[in-house]
Amino acid sequence: MLKGALHAHSTYSDGEFTLQELRDIFLAQGCSFLCMTDHAEYFDQPSIDRYVSECESLCDGKFGLIAGLEYRCARNMHILGYGATRPATSSDPQEIIRHIDSQEAISVIAHPANDSFDWIEAFDTLPSGIETWNTKYDGRYAPRSGTFMLLRRLQHRAPDMRAFYGQDLHWKKQYRGLHTMLDCDSLEPAVILSCLAAGKYAAQKDNLQLPSSGVLPEELLAEFDRTHARSRRRWLILKNFKGALDRLGIRVPESVKAQMRRIF
């Protein structure tokens, strides 16, 4: 069993960590792999070549660092390509899904917004998975039950669609406690991706385990909603307070903002 993490950004796009730093901090957490998803629009061919080469150079018998991209689409939808390394020219999400799939990579709609659910359900081309918990977008305390319900409806059409659980790591002061436990005996990137695609994993956060199927008891989904609502209320209070300070011309120190990112 390998411990790892999904959905991270480096200084190749808008992250604060270098690839070497990411390897070091996740190794220190007892992880064996990390799936990168730097933003595709930051790259040209020379930089994507450097990115892939550096990821490969940081793979060894202790750790697998897997290059991948996050594609920005119409209506601010984001689609992760775990193992994808070719930028795209289209902003149509279904074209992007096909583009990712053509690379034998894993296509995952990242942190889908509530108002995009109906649109996603109308897609003719569906992704390999839905990111049902993104601890940057949803918060560290609980995901939205509605994202799991979206996945459940899509699974009527695509039974092998998976639930993915990502950190969306950007900042040095950010929560990093959601991990992916992978039933895999190899650190080869291709093998790790194959095990992810086959759903041979579960998410782990403290004592909570969440399956790759995304099928959860109704009681747990209800608890998620209550916890998420409480966290959201606290976050909105702080956001409104910051907005008031901004209007008064008072700048919130970066150290305080960094601490808030870690808490939420």
Which residues make up each language-model segment?
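Short, flexible loop segments at the rims of nucleotide/cofactor-binding pockets, characterized by
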Residues: S10-D14, D44, A84-A88, V108-I109, ...
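Conserved beta-strand positions in the central sheet of alpha/beta enzyme cores
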Residues: C35-M36, V108-I109, E131
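Aromatic-lined carbohydrate-recognition surfaces of secreted/lumenal glycan-active proteins
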Residues: I106-S116
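Charged catalytic cores and adjacent phosphate/nucleic-acid-binding surfaces used
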Residues: M1-L6, L19, R23, R75-R86, ...
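Surface-exposed amphipathic alpha-helices with a cationic face
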Residues: K3, L27, S53-C59, D92-V108, ...
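An N-terminally biased module of ancient metal coordination in phosphate/nucleic-acid-related enzymes
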Residues: M1-A74, E254-F264
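Histidine-centered active-site/metal-ligand motif
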Residues: H7-H9, H39-A40, M77-H78, D101, ...
